[in-house]
């Protein structure tokens, strides 16, 4: 096929080669003038215009990493052309025919991607209706990680809520039996998905009549045969549901494996869950991404570092040597709006969208500008030029409902704004920003700003926020160990700070908390650091497998000798029976006859003793009751009475930290810590509590409770 007459839209594409043909059109690979490779589907004028419009409408609507991305459409000589993402690996059917049956790990890896795509279109009330191995495409068959894309939505149909379809369509062998009865719903796609799994495991297409013969598959892997049988059950009412597939023995047994053909796209499972990429778009539509999940998908919260170790905190945790060259190449390639290499593809997954969960409230001021996390879905970068003038403001927002990240650029061309300090008010935004919805749309200047913002979020801001805090671990009884949001481990002593970098595994002790006064940790101390790190990371993994509706993170807990002994054997067994997050949730005024209700923490496998939970935890140092605190804790703080009302209104620590009740709002508190800043920190009882104010808040409330009684 030629590129068309000069001056036409088709003539702007080069190197057109036919790569596929179906009943509704011919597909070509092509190349844009900027070098980007795309797929072009040519639909003849004999095709139904209604069907063409439906396919275009459906493809424009769908944005998901495992669905072929639609770029644009144009019409020439009575024919319709659809420009889409090119999957150079060909169809899954051709791949299996060439390579033979896939191993179980690879099959499960592909199945999980297809489940995600099918679930997404079902959530949009869309049936694919032609889900077959021939319509599943491999992005790049030369890569060790197989990424598949669901394509060809020419037969897709939109269902109303709880609706059904009534047209016989699909690929023989992959069609559910109820389709022939012309009354079917989303369960039909599950049947087709089972047929795809059967093809991957056997290399054969399912029979057009009757169920497939699974005898040979049962001998090889009974659990795989059982899943295929349940997915291809002739009775739609008894067919396994889409959401249940990932919980079957066959899938669960292979989810943790990382073979060359089945390892996950990201470097660790958390990145895989939380960083689904957007792809390039030619009409402002970007690829879908799953909602962000951090460990156990908990609500956002953040804690600023409670001490003055600012110099050590702000040391980058991402190696510039390994990352910067890649990022430079990405900036160069993406500025030309081209699809990058596999390395750039992987990097694109890491940097779009930006992770903001549980980082809300963080601020950083550098000579280049001010970085602020306004909400768990919104951050900004106020870009500063020479002369301390704000050039523009980059605002990044993530919509958890539409699953889209948008970058807004506010240019300060009509007014002069001077750079502000870290804690100053936000600069007012312009009314007409320029918006971008995919990484490839960003011009070079905006790309540079975006990369700076993303790096600051990962290397500095995430290293300030603690995910899990273990006070007084058995290995270091006079310290507090923290697993940070970026994966670093920080063990805080009265006069030093031990840091284990996740990026390179290096462990250093920062004397007095300064970056220029450090020493490498060795010997027995290094072994203890590794023990603490292993315990906290295992605890994090345990929490990540819990019900995502439970509000767990961030977690702060203390453990006495009895519990620590158990903790060293099994991290999951030491979780407090009531929430250890003293600073995270509200505690009402509870009378002596009422029982304190546990909040959002798991119940231990075995009761620690017959004593009540609160008394046992106080004895062991696990503070779980907001209305009680050990006497030693209360004695550390001096209470002050209001001379008029006689009520306790504040407490003060020996190091001059002060916590007082607000006079303007009944549930608001004001905290000052001179060792960090002279400014006041205001927080609500049921909001984010500064960590160094947590214990003081306990004591203040106990004092107030006793005074009332």
From Swiss-Prot:
| Catalyzed reactions | L-seryl-[protein] + ATP = O-phospho-L-seryl-[protein] + ADP + H(+); L-threonyl-[protein] + ATP = O-phospho-L-threonyl-[protein] + ADP + H(+)
Q: Which subcellular locations apply to this protein?
A: Cytoplasm, Cytoskeleton, Microtubule organizing center, Centrosome, Centriole
InterPro entries the UniProt entry points to? Kinase-like_dom_sf, Plk4-like_POLO_box_2_sf, Prot_kinase_dom, Protein_kinase_ATP_BS, Ser_Thr-PK_POLO_box_1_sf, Tyr_kinase_AS, Zyg-1_PB1, Zyg-1_PB2
Query: Per the record, GO CC terms?
Result: centriole; cytoplasm; nucleus
- Root EC class: transferase
Active site per the UniProt annotation: 130
Where does this protein have compositionally biased stretches of type Basic and acidic residues? Answer: 262-291, 302-313
Outline the segment boundaries, as ranges, of region: Disordered: 254-329, 591-633
Q: Quote one Gene Ontology molecular function term.
A: protein serine kinase activity
- Name the EC number(s): 2.7.11.1
Q: Where is the composition biased (Polar residues)?
A: 607-627
Q: Any coiled-coil ranges, and where?
A: none
What keywords appear on the UniProt entry? Answer: ATP-binding, Cell cycle, Cytoplasm, Cytoskeleton, Developmental protein, Kinase, Nucleotide-binding, Serine/threonine-protein kinase, Transferase
Q: Which SUPFAM superfamilies match?
A: Protein kinase-like (PK-like)
Domain of life, per lineage = Eukaryota
Query: What Pfam families does UniProt report for this protein, alphabetically?
Result: Pkinase, Polo_box_2, Polo_box_3
Q: Where does this protein chiefly localize? A: cytoplasm
Specify the Protein kinase domain's residue ranges.
13-251
Residues bound to ATP: 19-27, 41
Say which family it is in: Belongs to the protein kinase superfamily. Ser/Thr protein kinase family.
Function (record text): Protein kinase that plays a central role in centrosome duplication. Paternal copy is required to regulate synthesis of daughter centrioles prior to fertilization. Maternal copy regulates centrosome duplication during later cell cycles. Functions upstream of sas-5 and sas-6, and is required for their localization to the centrosome.
UniProt-recorded name of the protein = Probable serine/threonine-protein kinase zyg-1
Query: Organism, per UniProt?
Result: Caenorhabditis briggsae
